[in-house]
Amino acid sequence: MACPWKFLFKAKSSRFDLTEEKDINNNLEKLRQASSSPVTQDDPKCPSRSRHRNECSQPLAETAKKSPDSLVKLDVLPPACPRHVRIKNWGSGMTFQDTLHREAKGDLACKSKSCLGAIMNPKSLTIGPRDKPTPPDELLPQAIEFVNLYYSSFKEAKIEEHLARVEAVTKEIETTGTYQLTGDELIFAAKQAWRNAPRCIGRIQWSNLQVFDARSCSTAQEMFEHICRHLRYATNNGNIRSAITVFPQRSDGKHDFRVWNAQLIRYAGYQMPDGTIIGDPASVEFTQLCIDLGWKPKYGRFDVVPLVLQADGRDPELFEIPPDLVLEVPMEHPKYEWFQELELKWYALPAVANMLLEVGGLEFPGCPFNGWYMGTEIGVRDFCDVQRYNILEEVGRRMGLETHKLASLWKDRAVVEINVAVLHSFQKQNVTIMDHHSAAESFMKYMQNEYRSRGGCPADWIWLVPPISGSITPVFHQEMLNYVLSPFYYYQVEAWKTHVWQDEKRRPRRKEIRFKVLVKAVLFAAVLMHKTMAARVRATILFATETGRSETLARDLGALFSCAFNPKVLCMDEYRLSRLEEEQLLLVVTSTFGNGGSPGNGEKLKKSLFMLKELTNKFRYAVFGLGSSMYPQFCAFAHDVDQKLSHLGASQLTPTGEGDELSGQEEAFRGWAVQTFKVACETFDVRGKHHIQIPKLYTSNVTWDPQLYRLVQDSEPLDLNKALSSMHAKYVFSMRLKSQQNLQSPQSSRTTLLVELCCEGSQGPSYLPGEHLGVFPANQPALVQGILERVVDGPAPHQPVRLETLSENGSYWVKDKRLPPCSLSQALTYFLDITTPPTQLLLRKLAQLATDEAERQRLETLCQPSDYNKWKFTNSPTFLEVLEEFPSLRVSASFLLSQLPILKPRYYSISSSRDRTPTEIHLTVAVLTYRTRDGQGPLHHGVCSTWLSSLKPQDLVPCFVRSASGFQLPEDPSRPCILIGPGTGIAPFRSFWQQRLHEAEHKGLQGGRMTLVFGCRRPDEDHLYQEEMLEMARKGVLHEVHTAYSRLPGQPKVYVQDLLRQRLAGEVLRVLHEEQGHLYVCGDVRMARDVACTLKQLVATALTLNEEQVEDYFFQLKSQKRYHEDIFGAVFPYEVKKEGAVGPPSDPRAPGAHGKS
């Protein structure tokens, strides 16, 4: 018989470090030897290592001397003090000395030159299948080591029982080749394995694990019954209890008992023919396996997959889990009622089912176990991971967050609220759950206990730090040592990948390709693609954007050019200008910001490019610009880039494209992109250029197919704010109209309103002076009614309906996400833009609906750019006017709901201070009316300004606050300011002076000099806020007020830039150059351009700067955020000559009235 004693007395120095250990069976703590206490403070006064080494006892050496030579191996290392690794908490300064790691089993995933610590399932933590038993000479030492560990856990030594058990195990292994654990040993092993699990944050409960011994079962049916008992015990009506069920151990690897599911309870994931996924994407492969094995799918988002159980190595069997054993929690939010509309839920019991318990050389491949949830497991990983349910953006939109702007931190705000909903929902249903902060605190306590009781605590920092909150949890600051002890829970290879099928007819045929063959095929394809791409012409695609639109189009362009070129898409601020000397093809997609400038992420490249004098590499290029034709500097930056590249010697591939957000921007981009692609293929002689299949994105949506849409009756009442919040990704709330006051005199032909909005309650929405209010208007009832009268085969105007679209494969209908369920009348009133002239693409689709051949041909002619632009700028027709011009059009309700553009909000600078009127928001609104056809056409009205002017007190106004971080009062209130705002450009400055007045009256703060430069036509006609300005001057809030009048009888026209030149040159220099003050400009783009030119002239003259130097000077002012512009587009692309016909900006086509559009 093999001698067990050499293993019994095997050197384990760390075990002798403890004079007393924790009793695993009664959970009592014993004291460690004082001289080797592993918990210390990080203090330079601590004893040195050499001193500590001299004080260490040597019990191992004494044991060796007293033992007979026949019972112990003497070739052990010389007695020495235990080596330790010092672990520090950088938050508290406390340190631990880890000695337990010396008992680690094998190596982890790290290599000498690289760390694999962030690999999900490293080989060191995975045990694969076996095809033969573990050899006795390998099993025996592991078995004896476990028996030693087990008996060392008792408070009082049981030497005789210990020695007897060692001898019995040794004999059993010698006789049978394996051994069986006793019931108590199994309980101890399962608990100890949880205690040793480095990736688990909830181990403080390890000793309370309930162990169900199912080693006697022999069939899959018995396995199912044991699992049902487990689920019933663990769920406990929501008061979750931790438990494990252990099935028979592995013998020769051919008779394994395994649960094929990753978790006992998990939701299915269905891969649909069009590539979309219904349910949990993480379960797609396993769900398909269940279907192949005979399960009938239900195609719901939250269908519980059946259990797939394998007994004694036989083929698996399916078992549906009884619904009464699956406790589910519906999700709701304590604040957001709409959260329930997401129809989310989650199961209460997290039970891992596919891991393997290793103990003493034995392997238990079937051992499902559970704890309870930490909230972030559901709220972050299950709901928000992009490869899971991925609800983050939808929640962000419903919250009204700026989901197009990463810097707004919308993801952080949304994920917190999702986690609030998860915790709230579980707690409301009295289901056990733990928040991540409490879990982190409990782990820190557990870790301290472990270092005191056994000198170490294996921990994987990457897994233990929660997926949100990071450094505000204590575990973030804790250094950790990761190692594998025994007993241990290991990962396994998925059972269906290694199972040897006995009945080949039941074997799923879907995955016939062997893994190695698949890897080789993928590798070969990757190498082939790399070589193919490397042989292609390189194309660099640059974008600059403020809203993200240019980036989206640039990436679409990259997808198109990847069909024949080797494209790379970069933001301008990521591009090194030196690469121009290496380019073959350069494509640029950019918007224009402010008064003809570049977006913020294009400033750096613009400055470098425009300073470049020569270029030796004569590459090809093409540019596409995005903008709004209401601005005089329409697409100016794109044209500037085009001209500069041309001057440097680069060769233009196609003319610069222009995408007008008021006129079919997307269609213009598609046409330019396809044309540029074709010319590039010809220019670079791309092989097979006439047979390249371009992406569907560039070929679809050019015709109207009524078979792809249908209307379904719906009974859900419309919540306007909720619908607008979801559609526009804004937090929309309603305010009531308090009052309106016309700020212009009765003699004026125009109207400018002071609109005062109020909210119920003691506190209104949060905003800062200078920020904008976005207002969602309603279309005029006459326009809506006129369109409704011309709809064919439509539902009743007030019948709620929802629009559904047919899937690409035509097999099912999908709810359209563009519009909420509503009546046709509501859609035309609140959601659809019926005043903007139809785009060319919309006219092309309308041509299909014309029953008169002449009208059809006329509509097709209008799709041509030259005819279209002339027709559009002359008539600027509303959609009703189009229907009147082409009376044979047969327009359906589904056409209107699917093809008309979305009505955009209008932005107004807030004209009040929240500190002064906390429950109110004031707006300065110019009511717009104009006639087309050089003043001879029909009268048109501004959508929002006309709607606001028609409201009665207490009427509701849906709105939201938009931040304007670049247009706010100085952080240092002592800095002097110059405010320049003619006409309605005065709007934000009223909020400035009201804020300064409040600070002076209630806080005793006296702000720096504030000079106002205002402009209007005549003092007795349109001098807005004249009395209030004078009052502010009397109270010292405004240091000086200068007004330019442009229509005084018998006097020359004077504008604000004239006042700057004539009266304020010295003040401008003092404020900007000497006192580091701020200058603000608010108004239309032409005024802003003229003011900027005047200021540059003044500065250049005073400081003797050339043109390049003065441009750099103002670039620095903007970089320092001391030159502020709030520009709106009050200029039409066509000129209306009649005096007073064109009013200030509340243009029905303008996305911004007093803000940047």
From Swiss-Prot:
UniProt modification remark: Polyubiquitinated; mediated by SPSB1, SPSB2 and SPSB4, leading to proteasomal degradation.
Binding residues for Zn(2+): 110, 115
Residues the record lists as binding FMN: 545-547, 549-550, 591-592, 628, 635, 661, 665
Keyword Oxidoreductase: yes
Alphabetical list of InterPro entries matching this protein: CysJ-like_FAD-binding (IPR003097), FAD-bd_FR_type (IPR017927), Flavdoxin-like (IPR001094), Flavodoxin/NO_synth (IPR008254), Flavoprot_Pyr_Nucl_cyt_Rdtase (IPR001709), Flavoprotein-like_sf (IPR029039), FNR_nucleotide-bd (IPR039261), NADPH_Cyt_P450_Rdtase_alpha (IPR023173)
Binding positions for L-arginine per the UniProt entry: 263, 372-373, 377
Tissues expressed in: Detected in both stimulated and unstimulated immune cells and macrophages with little or no up-regulation following cellular stimulation with lipopolysaccharides (LPS) or concanavalin A (ConA).
Residues of the FAD-binding FR-type domain: 730-970
Binding-site list for NADP(+): 750, 929, 984, 1017, 1046-1047, 1053, 1055, 1057, 1090
Catalytic activity as recorded in UniProt: 2 L-arginine + 3 NADPH + 4 O2 + H(+) = 2 L-citrulline + 2 nitric oxide + 3 NADP(+) + 4 H2O
Subunit structure and binding partners: Homodimer. Interacts with NHERF1. Interacts with GAPDH; induced by oxidatively-modified low-densitity lipoprotein (LDL(ox)). Interacts with S100A8 and S100A9 to form the iNOS-S100A8/9 transnitrosylase complex. Interacts with SPSB1, SPSB2 and SPSB4. Interacts with ELOC and CUL5 in the presence of SPSB1 or SPSB2 or SPSB4. Forms a complex with ASL, ASS1 and HSP90AA1; the complex regulates cell-autonomous L-arginine synthesis and citrulline recycling while channeling extracellular L-arginine to nitric oxide synthesis pathway.
Protein's name in the database: Nitric oxide synthase, inducible
The organism of origin for this protein: Sus scrofa (Pig)
